[in-house]
Amino acid sequence: MRRYLAVRGGAGDVAEPDLNAKPQDNLYLAVNSEWLSKAEIPADQTSAGVNTELDIKIEKRMMKDFADIASGKEKMPDIRDFDKAIALYKIAKNFDKRDAEKANPIQNDLQKILDLINFDKFKDNATELFMGPYALPFVFDVDADMKNTDFNVLHFGGPSTFLPDTTTYKTPEAKKLLDILEKQSINLLEMAGIGKEEARVYVQNALAFDQKLSKVVKSTEEWSDYAAIYNPVSLTEFLAKFKSFDMADFLKTILPEKVERVIVMEPRFLDHADELINPANFDEIKGWMLVKYINSVAKYLSQDFRAAAFPFNQAISGTPELPSQIKQAYRLANGAFDEAVGIFYGKKYFGEEAKHDVEDMIHNMLKVYEQRINDNNWLSEDTKKKAIIKLRALVLKIGYPEKIEKIYDLLQIDPERSLYENEAQMATVRTKYMLDKLTQPVDRSVWLMPGNLNNACYDPQRNDLTFPAGILQAPFYDIHQSRGANYGGIGATIGHEVSHAFDNSGAKFDEHGNMNNWWTDEDFAEFNKRVGQMVDIFDGLQYGPAKINGKQVVGENIADLAGLACAVQAGKNDNVDLKDLFENYARSWMQKQRPEAIKTEVQVDVHAPQPTRVNIPVQCQDDFYTAFDVKPDDGMWLDPEDRITIW
């Protein structure tokens, strides 16, 4: 066992406050313990912390704006398709109408599943079901070809399981969670007009099919290997896997043109597809579709349905209360028209001065990154040159998009129809839009995140960075706070996203976003050795009631490590106070979570829990030891040979 395993992450438990903690022993607790000792988690949230507070701040602003615009107190902004968001919001917040409608809006669509009396009927109606608001026991998507990202291709995979991850089925909580889902689903089906005994049989069949799925679909750890989703097979080879279901006929009816090949995201699922999708399993498939359907649509119905669909989510998240009705109305409208809403937010709350300042910081960080690549002591010159070509090709998307994606023009809201009917109609439009992309080149101008989102991302297939206006505010960024604090906040975030271009997944893609090996064999072997060190230092780390899977979170941890290293270097170039930088970095990950939420996050998220993302990256920065005079006997000490450097 390596020495650092005793002290990785500092002394103490970052899930518990320690008012006596010193930065030399546990930076995260030294900075955040006072807040942790007093913080209360909102009743409708899974956590409290910097990110939650920022999410709530954005949401409160937008909810007031929506209320004022919907009431006529404020005029409708001149933003394309924003009026549709307000129209949907008005429908969603009318709970008098929703409560009066009860289960009526879903009866026709529910009946379409109930009318499936055998496997032949399922096959005959599969196209209509796929285009509607239903889950089928397989998934198709259209996205860029990883090896030629100018073109879209058809992707195939398995459906999601009832529990958050395949690993959840092996935990002591699995039976309790499935029992809650069983009771909830029977109740919902009864509320929709199905007899109790009939509902019970449907749900038991659904649970049986879900167990079969859980053995063949990918876990979160497997999904974290991004390049492993690229498994192209010929159409002939793909169709040969389906003996019982007429996949050839199905694809003819849903696709705008014939495809020559399919990208199989889950080869194991495809190998078992015929064992799952066949006449012998029909009753289980039908039950599974009903349970998926009723649990997904309950949120569009009455308050009674909303409440009846809450226990399973409550058990997974620990959240004691449903979001308020008005909050749900805003969230549904924002979710359906997020790009228009994000443009509204960006134009109103994100100033040009701030945008230019952030752009300046990003360009500074890119210069630092290039210098760090040049100074790298384990890469060959050939690989360095190619890494810099990729770095210089990065496309920046800051604040909010200038144009709205075409899909929002196609979505229509009918104020005379129910909330469910509007949502179902939009689901059909989105599915058709997705399939139609097969005949079109990849649109690289599309944003993956709306302007009002508190987040940021790197897209390996477009080689672009997105920094929405939502994250470009305190404590991550404030034009009035110290430059050191800004580098510890948004600077580290910028470095983090840039580093995704060179993490264990991004490193396999070139400057055009194509999966293409631009490394020498020797360099890639050394890179993978360092990736392995990153896996080891996090693997098994205890956080509250859960242990971290180092392999599952390694890509994000590489980005954290390299992002902070770049922020420190950029800060030094600007002569900032490094204590400010490290302390704001620790503050930016401040969080208090419910135990249930921790367990679920560790199972399903490729990010380590936020508090665990502070001390280990900091421990690997030599400048931290100088800034805080850290000694070998201190809890934050790592021996120099155990400090990991990748970029």
Swiss-Prot record:
Its cofactor is Zn(2+). Its EC number is 3.4.24.-. One of its GO terms (cellular component) is plasma membrane. Binds 1 zinc ion per subunit. Zn(2+) binds at H496, H500, E556. InterPro entries: MetalloPept_cat_dom_sf, Peptidase_M13, Peptidase_M13_C, Peptidase_M13_dom_2, Peptidase_M13_N. It is an enzyme of class 3 (hydrolase). Residues 1-647 form the Peptidase M13 domain. One of its GO terms (biological process) is protein processing. Pfam families: Peptidase_M13, Peptidase_M13_N. The active site is at E497, D560. One of its GO terms (molecular function) is metalloendopeptidase activity. PROSITE patterns: NEPRILYSIN, ZINC_PROTEASE. Keywords: Hydrolase, Metal-binding, Metalloprotease, Protease, Zinc. Belongs to the peptidase M13 family. This is Neutral endopeptidase. It comes from Lactobacillus helveticus.
